[in-house]
UniProtKB/Swiss-Prot annotation:
Location of the UVR domain: 201-236
Subunit architecture: Interacts with UvrB in an incision complex.
Record's protein name: UvrABC system protein C
PROSITE patterns for this protein: GIY_YIG, UVR, UVRC
GO molecular function ontology, one term from the record: excinuclease ABC activity
Length: 610
């Protein structure tokens, strides 16, 4: 039993971070404090603040502390520990994806494109946008308003004539000389920059001046082009909310919390424009109060993933934060500019946006609660069907290939809350006869299970997408395993599609019962199985398509001896891309600079037989 009195005797009155461990030496909670002794002493009073704290203290085996120079340093260290260890009793932000941006590259003829990840590519970044769909929508709009290129560099460098985008007025064709000047292209790039910075008025003023100049020079075709561009920009302005006050860069956060489930909704405003919104559902330990949730979420959201996220000038939230000043100081240091946090007395247009965020948070939470109810119903139905007391982990396998080529196996994982995408796996299947799905399934199962597994990674159910043959092969594979964990624990279930391969007509083959089950189409258990099976199928197909595309590309030029990067580029440039190379005659290939007659014959023969 943990001796709190002896431990507290040696804890100093200094700022720092503490880590609480259970009997398995697993970190179950991470916290910080201005005064470690006072904070840690509060856990061992006779009357504790909440049931959550009681449960936490009951599981403490030992505590470690780290003294820091300041509360600010403690705040950073705390969130690093939380991100690394994902403690059971901390509020955890489950979303760990980087956010997409719009990138304006630093080329002679800049390209505008979407970008996600660390900002290593030279250029100007605009965002972040809440999702890839918002970026695509903005890029489509920009292409209609400003005709600058969005194509890949490899495509741009190998053009000998303008592409379709030029023909329909969506690009100035900078890839080919003689169509537009560098100055004209630079002008459109500058308009894109102004538009993305929220300076729509300057864009219109600039275009009006250009239109008037063209009219004075009697270049009525150019004047008409500028007129159409002005009308398009103004049409966009009319659809967007125009604020009476300058909003600049800010995030507006509202939290809705019911029945142990929280929704944090964020509106992203950049350069005075709302780029979009997004809802988050952090993992919240039982009996967590709202103030702790607000403090922890804001810290995690901006500190744990700051390398991929732009920290705005201001953060507005509808919950009081206990450490506003300390958090603002840390964020300012991380962002390289002053960051203010407002958690009260919000007025003007900002209050309108905060109300909008609150409405969205409550609506998203209501929907999530309904979905959770449906998920629980499906799980309860499946437990009853299979006569299982509990289902902690389910895995499902599927095989995908084209005529036996580029075979890929997938494994998806579900728990009682739905998909565990961080545990999804794909396996490249090699060394088997093409189209042998049984051998492919065996190889996938061996790759995943023929090794030591932690107790929590052992599935309760393994679904095999296939009939009796696939299931029997899976059973044989499990029998052959020589592992330390209990290989008899997983229940293997085959999911056969039926004669007409229609959803709702599946047959379940239960390994331990040696019997088939036909469920009615409205069965909640069947709906859960279909969801898992479809997720596995989609995961396998996605992996297979990537592998097939890679094989298709490499079957062209990369695999031919004597064709390096320069010759490959010359072939693509002179023959009009890969399709042109494949359609070219021997004489046409030989006419490409740097390609000898002998090499042309090798290229021609390889492509004809690939």
């Amino acid at each position: 039993m943990f001796d709190a009195k002896a431990f507290l005797a040696d804890v100093p009155h200094l700022p720092g971070v503490y880590r609480m461990y259970d009997a398995k030496n697993t970190i179950i909670y991470v916290g910080k404090a201005k005064d470690l002794k006072k904070r840690l002493s509060s856990y061992f009073r006779s009357q504790l603040a909440s049931k959550k704290t009681e449960a936490l203290v009951a599981n403490i085996h030992h505590i470690e502390t780290t003294i820091t120079h300041s509360e600010t340093e403690a705040l950073l260290l705390e969130h690093n520990y939380i991100k690394e260890n994902q403690p059971k009793y901390n509020v955890l932000l489950r979303d760990d994806k980087s956010y997409p941006y719009i990138l304006l590259t630093k080329h002679q003829h800049p390209r505008i494109t979407s970008f996600r990840g660390s900002k290593k590519v030279a250029g100007e970044y605009f965002g972040p946008y809440p999702n890839a769909g918002a970026v695509r929508e903005t890029l489509n709009l920009l292409q209609k308003l400003f005709p600058i290129r969005q194509c890949e560099d490899s495509y741009y460098k190998n053009r000998s004539r303008p592409c379709l985008q030029y023909q329909i007025g969506r690009c100035l064709a900078p890839c080919v000389e003689g169509y537009y000047s560098q100055a004209e292209y630079d002008n459109q790039v500058n308009l894109v920059r102004l538009f993305l910075q929220g300076k729509d008025g300057q864009v219109v003023e600039h275009l009006v001046q250009k239109m008037e100049n063209a009219a004075q020079e009697l270049d009525f075709e150019a004047a008409a082009r500028f007129r159409d561009q002005i009308q398009s920009v103004r049409a966009v302005q009319e659809k967007q909310f125009v604020s009476n006050e300058r909003l600049d860069d800010l995030d507006i956060i509202s939290i809705a919390y019911q029945h142990g489930i929280a929704c944090v909704h964020i509106l992203f405003v950049r350069h005075g424009k709302v780029l979009g919104n997004r809802s988050y559902f952090p993992k919240v330990p039982n009996n967590t109060d709202l103030s702790e949730l607000a403090d922890t979420f804001v810290g995690q959201f901006y500190l744990q993933m700051n390398q991929h996220r732009t920290i705005p000038n201001q953060i507005i939230i509808d919950q009081s934060l206990s450490e506003v000043t300390a958090l603002a100081n840390v964020l300012s240091e991380q962002a390289g500019h002053k960051v203010s946090i407002a958690d009260k007395n919000i007025r003007g247009d900002k209050s309108r946006y905060l109300a909008l965020a609150k409405t969205n948070a409550e609506a998203a939470l209501t929907l999530q609660l309904k979905q959770d109810t449906h998920i629980r119903q499906r799980y309860d139905s499946l437990k009853a069907l299979l006569n299982l007391a509990e289902i902690k982990r389910m895995e499902c396998f599927d095989i995908s290939h084209t005529m036996g080529n580029q075979t890929v196996a997938s494994c998806v994982v579900f728990d009682k809350n739905g998909p565990l995408k961080s545990d999804y796996r794909r396996f490249n299947i090699e060394g088997i006869t093409g189209g042998d799905d049984y051998a492919a399934m065996e190889q996938a199962l061996l790759k995943l299970y023929d090794r030591n597994l932690e107790e929590e990674k052992i599935p309760d159910i393994i679904f095999i997408d296939g009939g009796k043959g696939q299931l029997n092969r899976a059973l044989e594979t499990f029998t052959s395993l020589n592992v330390s964990w209990d290989k008899r624990k997983p229940l293997l279930v085959g999911v056969a599609k039926g004669v007409e391969r229609k959803a709702g007509l599946e047959t379940l083959l239960i390994s331990k019962w040696d019997k088939e089950i036909h469920l009615p189409p409205d069965s909640p258990a069947l709906h859960l199985i279909q969801h898992i099976r479809d997720e596995s199928h989609n995961h396998a197909i996605t992996g297979h398509r990537k592998k097939r595309q890679k094989a298709f590309t490499e079957s062209g030029l990369e695999s031919i001896a004597g064709v390096g990067a320069k010759r490959r580029q010359a072939l693509l440039k002179y023959l009009g891309g890969m399709q042109g190379v494949k359609a070219a005659t021997l004489e046409e290939i030989q006419s490409v600079p740097g390609i000898s007659k002998q090499l042309a014959e090798v290229i021609f023969d390889t492509l004809q037989h690939s």
